[in-house]
Swiss-Prot record:
<dbReference type="GO" id="GO:0005737">
    <property type="term" value="C:cytoplasm"/>
</dbReference>
<keyword id="KW-0963">Cytoplasm</keyword>
<feature type="binding site" description="in other chain">
    <location>
        <position position="304"/>
    </location>
    <ligand>
        <name>IMP</name>
    </ligand>
</feature>
<feature type="binding site">
    <location>
        <begin position="300"/>
        <end position="306"/>
    </location>
    <ligand>
        <name>substrate</name>
    </ligand>
</feature>
<feature type="binding site">
    <location>
        <begin position="332"/>
        <end position="334"/>
    </location>
    <ligand>
        <name>GTP</name>
    </ligand>
</feature>
<keyword id="KW-0460">Magnesium</keyword>
<dbReference type="Pfam" id="PF00709">
    <property type="entry name" value="Adenylsucc_synt"/>
</dbReference>
<dbReference type="InterPro" id="IPR042110">
    <property type="entry name" value="Adenylosuccinate_synth_dom2"/>
</dbReference>
<dbReference type="InterPro" id="IPR018220">
    <property type="entry name" value="Adenylosuccin_syn_GTP-bd"/>
</dbReference>
<dbReference type="InterPro" id="IPR001114">
    <property type="entry name" value="Adenylosuccinate_synthetase"/>
</dbReference>
<keyword id="KW-0342">GTP-binding</keyword>
<dbReference type="GO" id="GO:0046040">
    <property type="term" value="P:IMP metabolic process"/>
</dbReference>
<feature type="binding site">
    <location>
        <position position="41"/>
    </location>
    <ligand>
        <name>Mg(2+)</name>
    </ligand>
</feature>
<feature type="active site" description="Proton donor">
    <location>
        <position position="42"/>
    </location>
</feature>
<feature type="binding site" description="in other chain">
    <location>
        <position position="240"/>
    </location>
    <ligand>
        <name>IMP</name>
    </ligand>
</feature>
<feature type="binding site">
    <location>
        <position position="306"/>
    </location>
    <ligand>
        <name>GTP</name>
    </ligand>
</feature>
<keyword id="KW-0479">Metal-binding</keyword>
Amino acid sequence: MGKSVAILGAQWGDEGKGKIVDLLTDRVKYVVRYQGGHNAGHTLIINGEKTVLRLIPSGILRDNVTCLIGNGVVLSPEALMKEMGELEARGINVRDRLKISEACPLILPYHVAMDHAREAALGKNKIGTTGRGIGPAYEDKVARRGLRVSDLFDKEAFAEKLKDILDYYNFQLVHYYKVEPVDFQKTLDDVFAIADVIKGMVADVTTLLHQARKEGVNILFEGAQGTMLDIDHGTYPFVTSSNTTAGGVATGSGFGPRNLDYVLGIIKAYCTRVGSGPFTTELFDEVGAEIARKGNEFGAVTGRPRRCGWFDAVAVRRAVQINSISGFCMTKLDVLDGFEELKICTAYKMPNGEIVEYAPMAAKDWKGVEPIYETMPGWSENTFRVTKREELPQAALDYIKRIEELVGVPVDILSTGPDRVETMILRDPFAA
């Protein structure tokens, strides 16, 4: 009997999902993206060679894997072709192994233009988007005016719809945001130039997944961003535009929720966040700067420096609730090597003095929240590239155990370096 496993971020994204997806794909036939778009940056290092995937599932680097892009993903044809070109230049067969749902909403140049215009207009109050048109594309989807992959294959109807949508966007871009309009003919020509390539990869993703379930093969669902960036459950409005949580697997791929066997939450041994929004344990001192330096905390897609802080058990407990997390993979344990002491946030002190153990739901409720810390001894020994649990320092084992106690879920995988081999699988999600 095959297993279906979801891998998702349990913090604010950038937890190291790509490496773990790549590590576990030797066990699966299908890897599925079910939300987000090319705003995701999944960095893989295999035998010292670095690959950053933004849209195509991380399983593409394994010859035995078929990669699926589900209906919950907003698809930029331009970004897809660029990423395919980069992979094919390295001899990786993409076209025969990538299948795309025809229900995927398209990201087109006017979405990108609107994204940039809005962020510029917000100034210091900006959300901190990646500027790739993700939000406006999801907005079109919900407003039922968006163009989908399936629309590409009726050129006359597509052109008519595109003209109407461009009129809508260009009016706002020119008259409200005072920026240049998006050219209709160029947009049309560019997308039609690659429509046939996309058509060759279109498939009924839902049926493929259900057939795979019947055949008893293993399936892996690859999440993007992180739980605390979920459109519904994150620190709204400082969130992404999709459901980054386990519920997104069902809605973003058509795979029934009862078919999911295991949810692997990815956590860093500390916390990071990119862009604006609440971050209770953020460090503004030399410790925070040292974590950022040692952890190379810069966004894989944007290059933006990440904000760094101590491990927040309160936020991760919320992720456990929302996702029914079965087990955790803890990454970047080695970044904490050499610190004399470490802190874990165990509760929040609200502005009214109340002590709470679960994270607020709305960004406004995070104002004035103070972290309550538990201090633990650090370790001087090196954990980088350690691949046996018994070789870890006792202080590191104690730190992991305390986090397990605080969040109520075991750490099943430990990552001690960026390469796929620098990992300890304590309990295999596909054998659990």
